[in-house]
Amino acid sequence: MASPREENVYLAKLAEQAERYEEMVEFMEKVVGAGDDELTIEERNLLSVAYKNVIGARRASWRIISSIEQKEESRGNEDHVASIKTYRSKIESELTSICNGILKLLDSKLIGTAATGDSKVFYLKMKGDYYRYLAEFKTGAERKEAAENTLSAYKSAQDIANGELAPTHPIRLGLALNFSVFYYEILNSPDRACNLAKQAFDEAIAELGTLGEESYKDSTLIMQLFCDNLTLWTSDMQDDGTDEIKEPSKAEEQQ
C-alpha cells in the first residue's frame, strides 16, 4: 500500500495532467510537510512546476492589466484607471500570497534539508525567483527589500554553482539566465545582464562536448534562451527612449 507521501506525489501528478495547479501545490506542500527527508529530484521538480504555473498565470494577468492601465492613463480615462487599479491590487494580493507561501517553505524546510550542491542551488535559485516576482510589482521600500533578497539568494546560489556544478549543468545555466533577467528587468542594468548572460553562455559552449545525453536537451534549450534575451536586450538598448512596456525577457527556463 502506498504511503501518504507517495499518494500525494501521485495526486500531484494527476493534478498536473488535469492542469489543476492550485491543487498540485496543495499536494506537494503535504509532501514537504510529511517528514524531514530531502525531496527527491522528481518531487522538487513537481513542487517547482506547481508553483511556476500558479504564479505564472497571475504574472501574465498582471502584465496585461498593467499594459491596459497605461493605455487608459494616456487616454485620460480616469474612471477606467481607478477600476483597473482596484483590479490590479487584487491580482497583486494573490501574487504576494503565492510568493510568501513558497518562500516560507524554502526558508523553514527545503533549503535547510538540501544535502547536495545541485539541490542547494535549485532551492536558492527558487528563493531568488520568487523574491524577483515580488519585486516586479512592489513599489518603494517593499520593492527595494524584495530586490535585495533576490540578489542575496542568487549570489548564494551562484557561489555554490560555480564551485560544484559544471558550466553546462541545467540548474547552473537556469540560475545564470534568471539572474541576468533580474539585472535587466529589476535593477535596470542591461550591461551587467548582458555580461552575465554572455559569460555563462561562453563557459557552457566551451564544455558542450562533455554534456551527457540526459541533460543535453535541457542545457541547449536554456542556451537558446540566452541568445533570445541577448538579441532582445541589445535591440532594446538601441531603441531606448520609448515609453512602451517592453516585451518581457524570454527568461526563466521551463521545468
Curated annotation (Swiss-Prot):
InterPro entries: 14-3-3 (IPR000308), 14-3-3_CS (IPR023409), 14-3-3_dom_sf (IPR036815), 14-3-3_domain (IPR023410). Pfam families: 14-3-3. This is 14-3-3-like protein A. It comes from Nicotiana tabacum. Belongs to the 14-3-3 family. Coiled coil: none annotated. It comes from the Eukaryota. GO terms for cellular component: cytoplasm. Disulfide bonds: none annotated. One of its GO terms (biological process) is signal transduction.
